[in-house]
């Protein structure tokens, strides 16, 4: 057990919403925080379900993830503030420092705010993942729940710009139809219940998405904006 209060922060959303970039940059600003990625809880390639229609692996299915281990790890982190499982991170997102320009003054101001958090009292753990709020058992473990969103066309364009993904055992490249038939369809199917009339391009249903805060991260959003917003949300939970 730890004497500190462990704050679990979830940054979730569809693939290519920008959640991992925001999580990585936040962890770079807040160096006392711990960052883990749900992607590190993918099963081995031969355990990932195969889609009956296309006869390919469905990496965007909830069944592709080891939720039992993920949930167990979150419980251990909540109790101890430390990671217990030896994780293999595949680093499938481009280095955000080479992709985005962040004003030095803004960066320093945000860093100073994070440095003001009393690390004798608080242990902040940031978790980035695409399947968090669809699973009630997982979702309820978090103190701060952030859903990063972007319009369908933006998500599709961003995903298409990626060369592929390192898995535990190989390298995956999306077939041409993969975003529509797997990525977005899985996001819609597993998150529709959080939205009014099940429309994942529409409004969150306050009755179903209780305590989930959203951030719209389209292509017109400067990276400093979500970083500042996430910082303020974390600071609210770490007041002396």
From Swiss-Prot:
Q: Which Gene3D superfamilies match?
A: P-loop containing nucleotide triphosphate hydrolases
**Positions of ATP binding:** 13-21, 158, 162-164, 208-210
Catalytic reaction annotation: beta-nicotinamide D-riboside + ATP = beta-nicotinamide D-ribonucleotide + ADP + H(+); beta-D-ribosylnicotinate + ATP = nicotinate beta-D-ribonucleotide + ADP + H(+)
InterPro entries assigned to the protein according to its UniProt record, in alphabetical order: P-loop_NTPase, PRK/URK
Q: Which SUPFAM superfamilies match?
A: P-loop containing nucleoside triphosphate hydrolases
Q: Where does substrate bind?
A: 39-42, 59-60, 159, 164-165
Entry EC no(s): 2.7.1.22, 2.7.1.173
Pathway(s) the chain acts in: Cofactor biosynthesis; NAD(+) biosynthesis
Q: Which GO terms describe its biological process?
A: NAD biosynthetic process; nicotinamide riboside metabolic process
- Protein's UniProt keywords contain ATP-binding: yes
Q: Which GO terms describe its molecular function?
A: ATP binding; metal ion binding; nicotinate riboside kinase activity; ribosylnicotinamide kinase activity; ribosylnicotinate kinase activity
Query: Which annotated residues bind Mg(2+)?
Result: 20, 39
Q: Any one cellular component term from GO for this entry?
A: cytoplasm
So what does this one do? Catalyzes the phosphorylation of nicotinamide riboside (NR) and nicotinic acid riboside (NaR) to form nicotinamide mononucleotide (NMN) and nicotinic acid mononucleotide (NaMN).
Extra facts: Present with 1460 molecules/cell in log phase SD medium.
Q: What is this protein called?
A: Nicotinamide riboside kinase
- Give the organism's phylogenetic lineage: Eukaryota, Fungi, Dikarya, Ascomycota, Saccharomycotina
Q: Which gene encodes it?
A: NRK1
């Amino acid at each position: 057990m730890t004497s500190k209060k462990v704050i679990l922060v979830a940054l979730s959303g569809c693939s290519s919403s920008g959640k991992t970039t925001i999580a990585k940059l936040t962890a770079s600003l807040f160096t006392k925080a711990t960052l883990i990625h749900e992607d590190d809880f993918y099963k081995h390639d031969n355990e990932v379900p195969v889609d009956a229609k296309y006869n390919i692996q469905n990496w965007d299915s909830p069944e592709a993830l080891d939720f039992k281990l993920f949930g167990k790890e979150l419980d251990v982190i909540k109790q101890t503030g430390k990671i217990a499982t030896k994780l293999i991170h595949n680093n499938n997102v481009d280095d955000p420092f080479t992709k985005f320009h962040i004003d030095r003054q803004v960066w320093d101001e945000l860093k100073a705010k994070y440095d003001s958090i009393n690390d004798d009292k608080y242990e902040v753990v940031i978790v980035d993942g695409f399947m968090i709020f669809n699973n009630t058992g997982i979702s309820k473990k978090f103190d701060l729940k952030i859903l990063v969103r972007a319009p369908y066309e933006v998500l599709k364009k961003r995903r298409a710009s990626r060369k592929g993904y390192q898995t535990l055992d190989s390298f995956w490249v999306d077939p041409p139809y993969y975003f529509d038939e797997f990525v977005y369809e899985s996001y819609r199917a597993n998150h529709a219940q959080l939205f009014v009339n099940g429309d994942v391009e529409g409004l969150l249903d306050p009755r179903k998405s209780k305590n989930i805060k959203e951030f719209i991260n389209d292509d017109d959003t400067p990276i400093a904006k979500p970083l500042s917003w996430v910082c303020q949300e974390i600071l609210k939970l770490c007041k002396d």
